[in-house]
Amino acid sequence: MLPRYENKLNEIRSMISTLLSQIIRSSEETLHAFENSENALYESARNHLKNLQSDANRIDNEIIKTFALFGPEADELRLLVAYLKMTNELDRIGDGMRKYSKRLEEHSLGGLDLSVITNTIIQLHKTTLHALQYLYECLQSKELCDAEELYRKVMVEESKNDDLFSIMEKELLTLIITSGELSVEYVKVLGTLRKLERSGDRSVNIAALLLYAQKGGELHIYS
């Protein structure tokens, strides 16, 4: 591999890693705000993602320029395709986190009683956060990252995510049925929490893309 091309790949990987770190920071602060009822932190959490779209576009542009300048062969082409798709997944995760943070703030300020599902929300959020942290660790240590092991770890978190969401969905459906005029607010909460469920799916997609980049084979991702 040409040194200039390898340097460009490392630069793109670093840009993706930085974008992911901003999403993680936003997720951590949103979780802290919810756990500790620190409503002022929600806006701070979203500020980490204020340049999300432009940052993702800049990464895409670098990838496209690399395609054009270096004409990569099969293995390198596979890596660039994976990076391009990963950026799209991160953009969607970040956008989902921004909306989740905003809506969770609204639920908290609205005084809606979420006590019956508070612990489950926290655990659900942690599964999505752990998956993102595993992805970040892999991007930070290219030589040490075992993509197969990463995929297994992220799948474990996604499985926990699914189980927790199912539990919480049942609790919320009970609240929707029994809460009269507040039912519509609990429907909104259910929609908010689906953002975390989708984040888990997209984290699996990124792990699958890293596995594809490292090992090849068929690529299977959630739509």
Residue locations for each model-derived region?
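Cytosolic, long alpha-helical scaffolding segments
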Residues: M1-S223
